[in-house]
Amino acid sequence: MIAATPAKSKPSDVNLEQTFKGVSETSKIDLRRSRAAYRPLELSPTPSIFARNYQRNAVDFTGFFVLFWVAVSIMIFMSFLENFELTGRPVVGTIFKYFQSNLLDLAKADLAMSSMFLLAFPFQKIFALGYLRWYGLGVYLYSILILLFLSHCVLRCCLSNWSWTHRAMFILHSMVILMKLHSYNVVNGWYSYCYHSLNKLQSKKTDLDDDERSSVEFYEHCLNHHGNTYPENLTIPNALDFLFMPSLCYQLYYPRTAHVRIHYLIECALGTFGCIFLLVIISDHFMVPVLAKAIRTIIEAPEDASATYFAIRLGHTVAFLMFPFMLSFLLVFWVIFEGVCNFSAEITRFADRNFYDDWWNCWTWDQFARTWNKPVHYFLLRHVYVPLNSFMSKSLSTFFTFFVSSVLHELVMGCITLKIRGYGLFFQMTQIPYIIIQRQKFVRRHRLLGNIAFWFSIIIGIALIAALYILF
């Protein structure tokens, strides 16, 4: 039996009118919305943010900085977890044992070495009061004292029963104090000469001629900078201020910030210790095993092994060390210039935080020397290059400036490894012919190729020099 289906009633004219009216209103609303949604975008020829030879204002890369620290935290946590599963302790490793040994002895030695800087204050008071002249006996006496300080630092570092990590920290800090001592004494010695020369001219009873008046103006300009004058600057607080300041060049005036930001000090301290911890993890996991295997291979090498055999072993070791050493180099760079220097600058309210420029874009080695470590660059320029250039040509002054820098680098490596091999001296001096080649027109026209060559030399060079000092 089939049930009958009731017939549908036809809509009335009133319902049809209301229905079409609603559809019409909806169509009008959609039209207005679509006009706003599909109107043309305001497009213009704009390169990518990461495109070369283009700078976009107000581009914020803070997210990459946050990503880096998140990755660091994850890596540290994973290291803790792995160590705890294997040994039951979160922190293990050879490098951690090095850090824990002889810490008190290192602290005492470093404090004594740093305190020697304060002896420069009474030493310069002698010249300010006129008991001795700087350009005379003063320069010779200072040269003897600075050599004694350097000898003390080297002997204290090499003869102590310290690990290589302690030797590295001590000798690097010694080099910083050495440069600060030199700048403080040389600049204040020059001020003492200007001060006594000015007093001599002003005490003349006769009228000054034009040259003497020009000399008076010159000396007054040198001895007064933004209201800070010599010899009023020769005080213990001023010497301590320069000791803790992230500058290697002494002067009467430095720009200052309004106040010290405690939260920023905490941020710098946490970042520094986090990077140091990450450096330890990289060393223990990716450097020590490779170097231990290489040392074992060299010791167990057959007696008739040729130079080719050792060259292959060296190349194999360098290949496995390139990435961890490159990463360590970047972390050390951050620790020094973003962590330690900014912490020191914040404490002393030192306002000029331009400790480096965009050295990662360098396409010549002289660019790198000027931009990656600006405090040392300013020191070498002011206290080495300019004095040499007063009686030498520009090329000879540049050569000897590189030579002084290379000798200091070799001294640092010798104190850390307890070996004098000359690898650092040789490779740093080879930068001079590289610079000559990089200044040719072809390289200047193809800066990308220069930057690629720069990064290859950095990546290979750091691992190669480290492997040479450790293995041979």
Swiss-Prot record:
It is an enzyme of class 2 (transferase). It is found in: Endoplasmic reticulum membrane. Pfam families: MBOAT. The chain crosses the membrane at residues 61-81, 111-131, 135-155, 170-190, 262-282, 317-337, 452-472. InterPro entries: MBOAT_fam, Oat_ACAT_DAG_ARE. The active site is at 409. The keyword Endoplasmic reticulum applies. GO terms for biological process: ergosterol metabolic process; lipid droplet formation. Its EC number is 2.3.1.-. GO terms for cellular component: cortical endoplasmic reticulum; endoplasmic reticulum membrane; perinuclear endoplasmic reticulum. One of its GO terms (molecular function) is ergosterol O-acyltransferase activity. Glycans are attached at residues 161, 233, 342. Keywords: Acyltransferase, Endoplasmic reticulum, Glycoprotein, Membrane, Phosphoprotein, Transferase, Transmembrane, Transmembrane helix. The keyword Transcription does not apply. A motif (FYXDWWN motif) lies at residues 355-361. It is a multi-pass membrane protein. The modification Phosphoserine is found at residue 12. Sterol O-acyltransferase that catalyzes the formation of stery esters. Belongs to the membrane-bound acyltransferase family. Sterol o-acyltransferase subfamily. PANTHER family: STEROL O-ACYLTRANSFERASE, STEROL O-ACYLTRANSFERASE 2-RELATED. This is Probable sterol O-acyltransferase 2. The lineage of its organism: Eukaryota, Fungi, Dikarya, Ascomycota, Taphrinomycotina.
